[in-house]
């Protein structure tokens, strides 16, 4: 009796539905060290980490906020109700774009956002982000158009 319960418990902890995101932020000059121009970001949705993915329109899902006198840009990484979110790769080691205890991933209600500030706002940087869900991602959004509508609605709330 104990053995089947233990096996089911282990399987439920190990099994998860993975999704990946790439947040691509670039300046007109592709400066990686905080140049004069502001970077524009766009999200790429991926079912598998190394696939090409499906791009989200530039700027959709990103907004600015003040945090203790510091300007930050937050971008929704579309991992609602995920139990784990992590940065799996950053294409260059610019400390301004990858630091702090949380590595700049923040949970807000059932959503996760990645934020940038300081010199990173004016730097070209690409993040690869992993999300783990208890249920398939497709149960939350049936199509990319539903995801885009979700991001537009979030922009109106902010």
Swiss-Prot record:
Residue positions the entry lists as glycosylated:
122
Ordered alphabetically, the record's keywords are: Glycoprotein, Signal
Quote the InterPro entries the UniProt record gives. Answer: DUF7808
Q: Which Pfam families match?
A: DUF7808
Annotated signal sequence is 1-16
Q: Which PANTHER family match?
A: PROTEIN CBG13422, PROTEIN CBG13422-RELATED
Q: What is this protein called?
A: Uncharacterized protein mtre-1
